[in-house]
Amino acid sequence: KHSSARPLFIGQDIHRTVKFADPQNNLQHQLPAKMKLQRSLPTVQGSCQWYSAAILENPGNYSTLLEKDYHRYPALIPTSPFMDDKAPDKVKKLKMVWTADGPVLFWTAPKAKTEMDKAIQYVVYRFEKGEKANLNDASKIVAITRDTFIRLPYENGKVKYQYVVTALD
């Protein structure tokens, strides 16, 4: 309502979050309650952690909890349709090549008419052969990269995979 149709990301003070106990459960700090509240609010699209050095310090296992419980999978930068509402075209010439370093997936960047339509990153998804490709499942993201290739994980060829690459601008 008050974010003027813009993405809303709230700030989390890491040290204050771990310094005080959760009023509903004094055996833990406030991160679980804050994450539950944040995720219950449909207008909040994420959070930023302040200050960044505290992430490395990991007070109260804050970083570990984020990595293991709350942010296990990569996140994509949200779209900003108020700035640019046209997605880049699809990548071209997706091809896997065996190299001395193992399998590498190559693709060609899509052509862009304007700078705003130019692809700057690519998301590589991996699905088991025959599995329906669900691009909303972040657990299927293998990489987010600026390169137009990626060395693929190889697991002795026992499981066959299909890869999907999407472009981001």
Residue ranges and their predicted role:
Residues 1-82:
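Substrate-binding cleft of secreted/luminal carbohydrate-active enzymes
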Residues 151-169:
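Beta-strand-rich modules
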Residues 61-117, 157, 169:
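Pro/Thr/Ser/Gly-rich low-complexity, intrinsically disordered linker/stalk tracts
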